[in-house]
């Protein structure tokens, strides 16, 4: 029997400190808590022995939090459990997120020995004042030191995270960041525009009017748009094509894990706060780290939510995830998945969005226009049935 493709996502919810813009599930923790958490993760991985026989793992992604806070021994522990439990494709893409200043050459060698072949480094800005305002734990100079270590360790598939539309950021400071980053010749760049999320320090500042004036004034909509256009232009000049709303890569260096997610490949989340999609069912893990550790130790369920996806929900996901990609979605694929013509389900919406020049049709494919990409959140919301 042919094995089905599977993606693994491992959540490492530990940070030195939480950044001012971050609403991800993460917080600082003691060495003892981190060790206990890793032991619990290993137990969880081993619990999937029966399920694992049906799948071959194509991608593994360690996200957070800051996975690079793991010790070399903990990295080895986690990957030993994965390789003993799952069948992992020999060409699997294995990504680890990291922050500058949290690794040394020994840790990078441990990552490589464990099979990690792609690194995603959170830089966000090359301007030290902006980094300080973001609540980052590093300077640009410290990032450069980490980058040298990454090169020394021999990693050839490297993503750098950048942010635009930051408080106090100017078009000039953002262009300087792009220039400095492109000079390093990374294989991939994820470029995000700041979103003010409830529960973050930035949202609190915004509510209090601190981002309306002074040194940390938010850029205007026109400036934010200009930064977005600058990103596309400068990265294209550097040989990096845009393949998704916020992601750019050199040919062949697209993030396979994220592509799998947008293409609705089955995925298994491991760790507190992670989510899974297996056999048409979505389930979420308990978010509290201590409760997660205790429940794993006691053999209790760590699930807090289970949902068997209806056909309508699957159609929605097919459209709003697939349309994030520059290549868009395939009419034939929709027909094959659901036994229905996409026009019978979404005809009126497709016609309306094409008329508004937010969508375009080319042969079999439906995709966002350049303008549609700029207002993608509004466009994608149209596909909720």
Say what each PLM segment does:
Residues 3-5, 26-50, 55-340:
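C-terminal scaffold of the Radical SAM
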Residues 334, 350-356:
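Basic amphipathic alpha-helical segments that dock to polyanions
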Residues 354-364:
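A short, conserved structural fragment
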Residues 1-6, 16:
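Flexible, acidic/Gly-rich N-terminal and inter-domain linker regions that tether
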Residues 365-369:
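Minor-groove-contacting beta-hairpin "wing" of winged helix-turn-helix DNA-binding domains
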Residues 340-352:
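Short amphipathic alpha-helical interaction segments
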Residues 371-385:
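Short, amphipathic alpha-helical interaction segments positioned at domain boundaries
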Residues 13-24:
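Local cysteine-cluster metal-coordination motifs and their immediate loop/turn environment
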């Amino acid at each position: 029997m042919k094995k089905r493709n599977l993606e693994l996502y491992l959540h490492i919810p530990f940070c030195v400190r939480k950044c001012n813009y971050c609403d991800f599930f993460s917080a600082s923790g003691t060495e003892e808590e981190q060790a206990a958490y890793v032991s619990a993760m290993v137990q969880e991985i081993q619990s999937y022995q029966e399920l694992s026989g049906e799948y071959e793992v194509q991608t593994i992604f360690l996200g957070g939090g800051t996975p690079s806070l793991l010790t070399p021994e903990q990295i080895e522990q986690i990957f030993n459990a994965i390789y003993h439990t799952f069948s992992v494709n020999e060409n699997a893409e294995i990504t680890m997120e990291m922050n500058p200043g949290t690794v040394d050459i020994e840790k990078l060698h441990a990552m490589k020995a464990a099979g990690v072949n792609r690194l995603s480094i959170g830089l966000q800005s090359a301007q030290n004042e902006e980094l300080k305002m973001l609540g980052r734990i590093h300077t640009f100079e410290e990032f450069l030191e980490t980058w040298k270590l990454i090169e020394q360790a021999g990693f050839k598939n490297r993503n750098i995270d950048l942010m635009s539309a930051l408080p106090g950021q100017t078009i000039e400071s953002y262009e300087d960041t792009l220039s400095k980053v492109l000079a390093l010749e990374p294989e991939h760049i994820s470029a995000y525009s700041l979103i003010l999320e409830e529960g973050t320090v930035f949202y609190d500042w915004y509510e209090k009017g601190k981002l309306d004036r002074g040194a940390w004034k938010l850029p205007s909509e026109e400036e934010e748009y200009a930064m977005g256009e600058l990103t596309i232009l400068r990265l294209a000049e550097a040989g990096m094509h845009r393949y998704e709303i916020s992601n750019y890569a050199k040919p062949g260096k697209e993030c396979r894990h994220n592509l799998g997610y947008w293409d609705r490949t089955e995925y298994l989340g491991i760790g507190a706060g992670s989510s899974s999609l297996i056999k048409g069912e979505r389930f979420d893990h308990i978010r509290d780290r201590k409760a997660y550790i205790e429940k794993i130790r006691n053999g209790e369920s760590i699930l807090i939510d289970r949902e068997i996806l209806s056909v309508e929900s699957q159609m929605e996901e097919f459209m709003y995830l697939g349309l994030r990609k520059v290549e868009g979605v395939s009419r034939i694929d929709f027909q094959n998945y659901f036994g229905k013509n996409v026009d019978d389900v979404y005809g009126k919406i497709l016609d309306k969005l094409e008329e508004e020049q937010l969508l375009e049709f080319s042969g079999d494919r439906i995709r966002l226009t350049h303008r549609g990409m700029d207002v993608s959140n509004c466009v994608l919301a149209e596909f909720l049935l």
